[in-house]
Amino acid sequence: MQTYLVGGAVRDRLLGLPQGDRDHLVVGATVEQMLALGFTQVGRDFPVFLHPKTQQEYALARTERKQGRGYTGFVCHASPEVTLEQDLLRRDLTVNAIAEDEEGRLHDPYGGIQDLERRVLRHVSPAFAEDPLRILRVARFAARFHAQGFVVAPETLALMREMTDAGELAHLTPERVWKELERVLLGETPQI
């Protein structure tokens, strides 16, 4: 069993920004092992647990496959055989697909560190198109990181336009749209 810090906490630390939520990824473990260690399972659709002392989130490594439209209809597969690289591949942006192991070593199979240095928001894989909520997430990140000089990669913008033209945003619920818009509006640069 190997535990990694993933997502925004790693990204923000590398940018020298305050870290928010600390999400952890667990590779090589089962639900039963996590429960035996005292974790509390909170995820319905995929195995997410709360640490018994810190209450931070720990998710088992998983892959996702889309079956349907909108941001629902994902089939998640979590098992001890899912690798770190497979889990990171399902993430939205390269800058969010960086993991830090317990020894402080960074694992960056998709070029997130280089994109941080270049100030580029780029999708990890074509699977980005499977979740239209990611369009709004990219808009939120573009607004949030505008002051640091970040731009959306041309190929990511093109993919977002294709998704919009295909009507994918129409499949989002108003609650999910509002949640993302609220995060933009409450940010430091909502006008971007």
Swiss-Prot record:
Residues reported in the UniProt entry to bind ATP: 8, 11, 91, 137, 140
One GO biological process term: RNA repair
Family according to the record: Belongs to the tRNA nucleotidyltransferase/poly(A) polymerase family. Bacterial CCA-adding enzyme type 2 subfamily.
Enzyme class: transferase
Subunit structure: Homodimer.
Pfam families: PolyA_pol (PF01743), PolyA_pol_RNAbd (PF12627)
EC number: 2.7.7.72
Binding-site residues, CTP: 8, 11, 91, 137, 140
Function, as annotated: Catalyzes the addition and repair of the essential 3'-terminal CCA sequence in tRNAs without using a nucleic acid template. Adds these three nucleotides in the order of C, C, and A to the tRNA nucleotide-73, using CTP and ATP as substrates and producing inorganic pyrophosphate. tRNA 3'-terminal CCA addition is required both for tRNA processing and repair. Also involved in tRNA surveillance by mediating tandem CCA addition to generate a CCACCA at the 3' terminus of unstable tRNAs. While stable tRNAs receive only 3'-terminal CCA, unstable tRNAs are marked with CCACCA and rapidly degraded.
Cofactor(s) needed: Mg(2+)
UniProt-recorded name of the protein: CCA-adding enzyme
InterPro entries: NT_sf, PolA_pol_head_dom, PolyA_RNA-bd, tRNA_CCA-adding_enzyme
Record keywords, A-Z: ATP-binding, Magnesium, Metal-binding, Nucleotide-binding, Nucleotidyltransferase, RNA repair, RNA-binding, Transferase, tRNA processing
GO molecular function: ATP binding; CCA tRNA nucleotidyltransferase activity; metal ion binding; RNA binding
Chain residues that bind Mg(2+): 21, 23
Catalytic activity: a tRNA precursor + 2 CTP + ATP = a tRNA with a 3' CCA end + 3 diphosphate; a tRNA with a 3' CCA end + 2 CTP + ATP = a tRNA with a 3' CCACCA end + 3 diphosphate
